[in-house]
Amino acid sequence: MTKYALVGDVGGTNARLALCDMTSGEISQAKTYSGLDYPSLEAVVRVYLDEHNARVEDGCIAIACPITGDWVAMTNHTWAFSIAEMKKNLGFSHLEIINDFTAVSMAIPMLRKEHLIQFGGAEPVAGKPIAVYGAGTGLGVAHLVHVDKRWISLPGEGGHVDFAPNSEEEGIILEELRAEIGHVSAERVLSGPGLVNLYRAIVKSDGRLPENLQPKDITERALADTCIDSRRALSLFCVIMGRFGGNLALTLGTFGGVYIAGGIVPRFLEFFKASGFRGGFEDKGRFKAYVQDIPVYLIVHDNPGLLGSGAHLRQTLGQIL
């Protein structure tokens, strides 16, 4: 008889839940719920289990916030809870709550070639460290290492490191944003809101007044080639994505590959392919040769957060992935 566990991927707006086959890792019966409609994460889980008549003993849920102990208070939602209390209330034997990019990183060993698009570099080196990052509402970052037949995710808050410009244009952007918001982190330019910040800084640096645009407006105008400012912003976004990925590669020697997740890049895939992304990635001066062979992949799997939550739980309970 197939044994299933609950897996989840929870952001500021939606909670996506599914069942994971504990033998194969296959994800099934995924459903998305609006977080605004429920008073707690536990309430959403109960609704899902009732709707699917699911009897599970174990679960792993990825959440877009730092996980530092038993008490979890979501950064971009009102939900807050004790992991131990929720486990007890649900009658689970095992409940893991992990960072969303821990889950994405743990999905990488489970991905097949059709789930990836490569942007330069050679083949990944087996057993070497891996980096994963992705722009969405914010900028998520994690690393993954393989030690003693186990995958170990190294999550952190790498999206909040300083934005490090490396061209005259990027320097001007930094000065404009610093004057407006103070500290300028990488997330301030590499995210949905970050794309807006880039557009606004480009226009303001030219002494003009920016329009009140949303990220999708800027992307649409750039792709249609109807707004030079939007096109410059999107082009700069791609280059800075490359620079940031190259920094991750240097930091941990990620010859196992650098992986891009998140919902933004797939929206302008052809533009991204033709952009200065790889040039930015390799623009490391004396260490250009060091990063040239490191492959970069875009993850195009529908639910890497669910897949990785399942992988994390299976490994925690003793399986070798």
Swiss-Prot record:
Top-level taxon of the source organism: Bacteria
Binding site for ATP: G8, D9, V10, G11, G12, T13
Name of one Pfam family that matches: Glucokinase
Alphabetical UniProt keywords: ATP-binding, Cytoplasm, Glycolysis, Kinase, Nucleotide-binding, Transferase
Classification via InterPro entries: ATPase_NBD (IPR043129), Bacterial_glucokinase (IPR050201), Glucokinase (IPR003836)
Gene3D superfamilies found in the cross-reference section: 3.30.420.40, 3.40.367.20
Signal peptide: none
Keyword hit for Chloroplast: no
Primary location: cytoplasm
Reaction catalysis annotation: D-glucose + ATP = D-glucose 6-phosphate + ADP + H(+)
Single annotated GO MF: glucokinase activity
GO cellular component: cytosol
EC numbers: 2.7.1.2
Protein localization: Cytoplasm
GO BP: any one term: glycolytic process
HAMAP family to which the protein is assigned, alphabetical: Glucokinase
NCBIfam families assigned: glk, PRK00292.1-1, PRK00292.1-3, PRK12408.1
Family per record: Belongs to the bacterial glucokinase family.
Protein name, per record: Glucokinase
Source organism (scientific name): Citrobacter koseri (strain ATCC BAA-895 / CDC 4225-83 / SGSC4696)
